[in-house]
Amino acid sequence: MLQINSRLAVIDGWLVDTVKRKPINFRSPEVRLLLPNDDDYKKLSQQNLVDWTRLKKDSNSVLVGVKSMELFKHIKLVLREFFLLEDGRIILKRIRSKSRYKVVKKLTCKCCRLYLPKWGTVYIHPMLKDKEKPLAGVCEFSLDVNPDREYPLIEINVSHQYIIIEGFLLYLNERRLYRWNDNNLRGQVGLTKWAHLRKTYNPVSLDILYSLNSNFYFVKDDLLFQLLGKRVFVKFCKVMENGKCGKAPLWYRVKRTTTAKATHIAYAISNSTAPDSFKSKNNDYRFIVREKPIVENTISNLDYSDIKKQQFTEAEVVKRKISADISQIENVHTQFNSQKEKNNIRVNKVSSEILDQISKFPVSRVTLLLMSAGQDKNYIELVEELARRLEKICIEKTTQSLEEIRDTFQANPEMQARFDKEYYQSIEEYKITLELIKEDLLITLIKQMENMWAAEKKFSTEEEYVSPRFLVADGFLIDLAEEKPINPKDPRLLTLLKDHQRAMIDQMNLVKWNDFKKYQDPIPLKAKTLFKFCKQIKKKFLRGADFKLHTLPTEANLKYEPERMTVLCSCVPILLDDQTVQYLYDDSIIPEFEATSSYATKQSKCGRKMSLQMEPDLLFQEAIRRMRHLTAYDVLRRNYIAAFEELYMGNCND
């Protein structure tokens, strides 16, 4: 270190104001004011000083490492949070929204801010040389989240999602913590499932925190702080009995502080959100504290083992009391609970790696599956947009049908008010059902659409004319005169073909017609030439859950046809030796969907006459039955597939 005068010094090429403890740009007009003596100024100009503009030119990041431990002993450092982007740049956390690159890592370090005219702001931080030890109180940290760790994801009626981390129940939709012993939550979950989840996961950490005399609770898992987002900087302080000094502190408390003095990060919870019995006039906040310090403070005389022991001892007592109170509530409510719980509660496992990719909750199970499979972000966004459009189509059609039923009671306000209770409940229920259908069907439908360009059965694609009349293509022998495929073993070929032509056919790998007898349902093919030269007929089939075609039911089962999906498909018939007919269809074309079955038509006609023919009570019962039918899983599922086909064929102008 070279002392220029009583205030300025040069440390490893940096000009430092030792009074204000900050670096000074040599090109700044401030320097001349601080060095009125010409000899001092000349002495300074002879030094090999760092050119600040090179800091920005040599780095695309705002965080620049400097290998000078001596420098950082004489300047002030503050704690700042940064993001490491996938393109290698490091940016300040508050400008994250302006970047289109994915965040790879979140980090925080103590650094010094430098302002460069025309270049902007950079932050310098200490970079260790070989065999150097870090400065006391100066270190870099980042939230250390284990990407493989899994957490219980609780879904309530599909649209409300919670996660449990170290006993804290986090409502992901709002990124807000909830007490487990909360009346609203208990009513939403249902008493039986509420009790089961408590016994399985015991998410009572927030209840414990509110019951502690201490104002802090340690957490090891960094994912909680990552999901909660906004963090504060804190330090621990000692509290003496009755405010008097004693030989030893009786208690430790957490206090918010500046980034320069902070030892830990924490999430602050206002006491205003606590139950009245837990509120304290002297303490406005309680803190969930990250157990791992952000700095190793060698100056502090606090013993962290005593702090942890304080929390553990107090928390164990409180935990037993809370568990006993909740068990008593469960026993009391169970005796008087006779209502059937209708809420749809599901618990799944989700990894922190997947959670880190989600910007907004709730997130559908379809999206979670695609993320787990490592699908591209753009592909997932396309699937989400498709799901949104399908849901919109289904909701519009179903709501329109329900409105028609509701209009039946326009002339009777009393009956309409009675019906509306069931009506609005059905709307909520069918929206949940649609979400379940999306989970069951959407990925299957998309895969089926993608497979429409792949052959289900791989035949030879070579095209070769055996004679002017017969063509071999797609594994079939095609009779161009009759425009149909023909059995290679057909006796007529003895007179229609010469010996060398029949020998040519025998050497080819053609479809064996006896194999067709093994199939009861139509056979999907990827055979462009076959469908180009052969006559096709329109025939009705049933489409199953596997998105494949099946033969129509027999006369005995015909009554079940309304509950199945009927489609009209172009196909090539094949007459087999036993006089049975098999059908080949092109699976790259989606068949026409018969949106209105005879059953639906009949119901529509009955609906128009219903108000004229029925007594009010019978009319109400019939309306409820029709509404239940329209919102049933099977009907909504059929509508969902129909909407998918409409979008695929381009017939929907959504």
Curated annotation (Swiss-Prot):
Sufficient for interaction with SIR4 as annotated region, ranges? 322-654
Indicate yes or no for the key word Ion transport: no
Compartments in which it is found: Nucleus; Chromosome, Centromere
Segments crossing the lipid bilayer: none
- Which keywords does this chain's UniProt record carry? Centromere, Chromosome, Nucleus, Repressor, Transcription, Transcription regulation
Q: Return the annotated region ranges for ORC interacting region (OIR).
A: 449-587
Its Gene Ontology cellular component terms are:
chromosome, centromeric region; nucleus
Name the InterPro entries on file: ORC1-binding_dom, Sir1_ORC-binding
Domain of life per record: Eukaryota
Describe its assembly. Interacts (via OIR domain) with ORC1 (via BAH domain). Interacts with SIR4. Interacts with CAC1.
Q: What does this protein do?
A: Involved in the establishment, but not the maintenance, of heterochromatic silencing at the cryptic mating-type loci HMR and HML. Is recruited by interacting with the ORC1 subunit of the origin recognition complex (ORC), which binds to HML-I or HMR-E silencers, DNA elements that direct the formation of silent chromatin at the mating-type loci. Establishes transcriptional silencing by recruiting the three other SIR proteins, SIR2, SIR3, and SIR4, that function directly in silenced chromatin and establish repression. Also found in centromeric chromatin.
From the Swiss-Prot or TrEMBL record, give the protein name. Regulatory protein SIR1
